[in-house]
Amino acid sequence: MLQRTLAKSISVTGVGLHSGERVALTLHPAPENSGISFRRTDLDGEMGEQIKLTPYLINDTRLSSTIVTDKGVRVGTIEHIMSALSAYGIDNALIELNAPEIPIMDGSSLPFIYLLQDAGVVDQKAQKRFLKILKPVEIKEAGKWVRFTPYDGFKVTLTIEFDHPVFNRSSPTFEIDFAGKSYIDEIARARTFGFMHEVEMMRAHNLGLGGNLNNAIVIDDTDVLNPEGLRYPDEFVRHKILDAIGDLYIVGHPIIGAFEGYKSGHAINNALLRAVLADETAYDRVEFADSDDLPDAFHELNIRTCG
């Protein structure tokens, strides 16, 4: 299977969830073996240089997965666009933006899916590399845990836990095996969520300034405040899976393995990636010259190119 990039550049505007700033974002094709990179067009000189994404650049995970370089350049809330790039198997792309944060759009990855559909996807000449998990790797901290285990495909199982009436009405656990289920159908529409009291607290600290009922599920003491309700009965845990897929794709390759988590979040997801990369016996980078040898979870990627 070959690496892929966008067929053309494409742009969108939106608002940063935490900054409230208007953001212009453009996705560009990129050369093979270049990976996913970001560039802040509002910064000059070294501060405006291209940033090659790696797990070691995620240095702020308080409210999202945020790049913070050694020069102090920030690119925040990258997990939703990374999740969409993962769904399309995009290996190489340059993402330019004129603000410190990726726009939140509607709080899901669906607008970025539409953006990628409009741009189109093309195969390149180099072979796509996959990160294959060879042995279990687990991180536990403060009552939370995440782990990778070997698996011939890509499967995600997450459980959330909130002591709140809204969450008691839906299953706290969701599992998706991408050999038989579609990311676009099952995950892409799930929106970020937050509690009304947290929104008020964040705004007091100049955070969450761009959040509203059009780009997040907002919950009060008893109910969802969004008049349209939920997009899935278990939208909350599905969004956590959306986030996790984006966080994991920061490693730069599709993952062949199973990911499980209990009360997972950006910090612990990133810690798991770093733990895997720190143990050379835990993974291998593999290629599939013959697409028939691909695990079933990745066969759908073959139909998402425009030649």
Swiss-Prot record:
Keywords (A to Z) from UniProt: Hydrolase, Lipid A biosynthesis, Lipid biosynthesis, Lipid metabolism, Metal-binding, Zinc
Claim: Magnesium is one of the keywords in the record: no
Active-site residues (renumbered): 266 (proton donor)
UniProt pathway: Glycolipid biosynthesis; lipid IV(A) biosynthesis; lipid IV(A) from (3R)-3-hydroxytetradecanoyl-[acyl-carrier-protein] and UDP-N-acetyl-alpha-D-glucosamine: step 2/6
Gene Ontology cellular component annotations, sorted alphabetically: membrane
Requisite cofactors: Zn(2+)
Record's catalysed reaction(s): a UDP-3-O-[(3R)-3-hydroxyacyl]-N-acetyl-alpha-D-glucosamine + H2O = a UDP-3-O-[(3R)-3-hydroxyacyl]-alpha-D-glucosamine + acetate
EC number: 3.5.1.108
Any GO BP: lipid A biosynthetic process
Chain positions recorded as Zn(2+) binding sites: 80, 239, 243
Domain of life: Bacteria
Pfam families given in the database record: LpxC
Family to which the UniProt record says this protein belongs: Belongs to the LpxC family.
Function: Catalyzes the hydrolysis of UDP-3-O-myristoyl-N-acetylglucosamine to form UDP-3-O-myristoylglucosamine and acetate, the committed step in lipid A biosynthesis.
The protein's name in its UniProt record: UDP-3-O-acyl-N-acetylglucosamine deacetylase
